[in-house]
Swiss-Prot record:
Protein name: Ribosomal RNA small subunit methyltransferase H
GO MF annotations in UniProt: rRNA (cytosine-N4-)-methyltransferase activity
Annotated function: Specifically methylates the N4 position of cytidine in position 1402 (C1402) of 16S rRNA.
GO cellular component: cytoplasm
Lineage: Bacteria, Pseudomonadati, Pseudomonadota, Betaproteobacteria, Nitrosomonadales
Transmembrane regions: none
Matching Gene3D superfamilies: Putative methyltransferase TM0872, insert domain, Vaccinia Virus protein VP39
Subcellular localization, as worded in the UniProt entry: Cytoplasm
The keyword Methyltransferase appears for this protein: yes
Catalytic activity, as annotated: cytidine(1402) in 16S rRNA + S-adenosyl-L-methionine = N(4)-methylcytidine(1402) in 16S rRNA + S-adenosyl-L-homocysteine + H(+)
Keywords: Cytoplasm, Methyltransferase, rRNA processing, S-adenosyl-L-methionine, Transferase
Length: 321
C-alpha cells in the first residue's frame, strides 16, 4: 500500500454536499405543475429542492445507476416523486415506460458524489485503500482492476491520456505493465496509486500524482463521456417549448461536450454571411443558452472545496422542431 492511503471509516467522511444547489434549481425555472427529471439523483439534494418548488400536480422522475443512491432515495416518501435505477442515457426509454412524452426541465449533475469518493470499497479514490472497482453501477460491467489486468500498454496510454489529460500517460502505462509482468495483481487503489506515484517524474503543486489517472479510469469504466453525448440529444427531444436544460460539469472534457452541444443547437444557421439564402429559410435554433456559465461562489468553495471546478450551463428549448 502506498504512503498516504487512509483507512478512516467511511461513515466519518462520506457526507455529501450538493453543489450549486440554489443556482441549478433556480435555472430550471420550476413550474408548479411541471414535469422534471433529475438525471443524477446522487444523495437527493437537487431532487428535494425541486420537490419544494413543485405544486401538488407537479412530477419529478429521478434516475441513478448507483444502487446506494437508489437506497438513499427510499427516504423520500412523496407521491410526486419516482426513482428509477438507470443510467441517464436511457432517459427517453425510462420516461416512455412512465407514459411521459415531454418534460419541463432536465438537470444533470455530472459530479461524483462524496460518498462514492470517500467509501474505500467503491474504489474511486486514491485517498482510501480498497478494491479497484470504480463502477458507478456495481451490479454490472467491468471493474478498473479487470481492465488494468488485461489492457495493453497502448490501450492504457490512450485511456489515461484521453480521459485524464495526463502528460505522463505513457510512463504510467509502462509502469503498470511492468508491475503486471513482474507478477503483481493490481487489485487495490493503494497499489495503483503507488505505481503511478513512482512513474510520474513531476507533480503539479497541490495535486496528487494519481489524480488524473484515477479520473481517466473512472470516466472510461463508466463510459461517462459517451453517456453524456447520447443523453443531450434526448434532452432536446424531451423538452417542451420553454423547457430548461441545466448541466453541472466538473472537468473540461464534460464541459466541452455540453458547451458544443448547446452552441451547435443555437447556431444552426452558421452559413457564410453572404450566402444567397433568405434568413427565414435558415435553420432556427432549437436551444438558446441562458446567461453565462455559472461557477460556485467563493463562499461555496470555502464551505465545500470539492465544488471549485464545477460549471453550470443552462439552455432553454425553443418552439422550433
Amino acid at each position: 500500500m502506498s504512503a498516504g492511503i487512509s483507512h478512516v471509516p467511511a461513515a466519518q467522511v462520506s457526507q455529501h454536499v450538493t453543489v450549486l444547489l440554489e443556482e441549478a434549481v433556480e435555472a430550471l425555472s420550476i413550474k408548479p405543475d411541471g414535469v422534471y427529471v433529475d438525471g443524477t439523483f446522487g444523495r437527493g439534494g437537487h431532487s428535494r429542492k425541486i420537490l419544494e418548488k413543485l405544486g401538488a400536480q407537479g412530477r419529478l422522475v429521478a434516475l441513478d445507476r448507483d444502487l446506494a443512491a437508489i437506497q438513499a432515495a427510499q427516504g423520500i416518501q412523496d407521491a410526486r416523486f419516482k426513482i428509477v435505477h438507470s443510467h441517464f442515457a436511457a432517459m427517453a426509454q425510462v420516461l416512455a415506460s412512465l407514459n411521459i412524452q415531454q418534460v419541463d426541465g432536465v438537470l444533470l449533475d455530472l459530479g461524483i458524489s462524496s460518498p462514492q469518493i470517500d467509501e474505500g470499497e467503491r474504489g474511486f479514490s486514491f485517498r482510501f485503500d480498497g478494491p479497484l472497482d470504480m463502477r458507478m453501477d456495481q451490479s454490472r460491467g467491468q471493474t478498473a482492476a479487470e481492465f488494468i489486468a488485461t489492457a495493453t500498454e497502448q490501450e492504457l496510454t490512450r485511456v489515461i491520456k484521453e480521459y485524464g489529460e495526463e502528460r505522463f500517460a505513457k510512463q504510467i502505462a509502462r509502469a503498470i505493465v511492468a508491475q503486471r509482468a513482474g507478477g503483481m495483481d493490481i487489485s487495490t487503489t493503494g497499489q495503483l496509486a503507488k505505481i503511478v506515484a513512482g512513474a510520474v517524474p513531476k507533480v503539479e503543486p497541490g495535486q496528487d500524482p494519481a489524480t488524473r489517472t484515477f479520473q481517466a479510469l473512472r470516466i472510461f469504466i463508466n463510459q461517462e463521456l459517451e453517456e453524456l453525448s447520447l443523453t443531450l440529444p434526448q434532452c432536446l427531444s424531451l423538452l417542451a417549448p420553454q423547457g430548461r436544460l441545466a448541466v453541472i460539469s466538473f472537468h473540461s472534457l464534460e464541459d466541452r461536450i455540453v458547451k458544443r452541444f448547446i452552441r451547435g443547437e443555437q447556431d444552426r444557421d452558421n452559413l457564410p454571411a453572404h450566402f444567397p439564402v433568405r434568413a427565414s429559410d435558415l435553420p432556427q435554433p432549437r436551444l438558446v443558452a441562458i446567461g453565462r456559465a455559472v461557477r460556485p461562489s467563493e463562499d461555496e468553495v470555502r464551505r465545500n472545496p470539492r465544488s471549485r471546478s464545477a460549471v453550470l450551463r443552462v439552455a432553454e428549448r425553443t418552439a422550433v422542431l
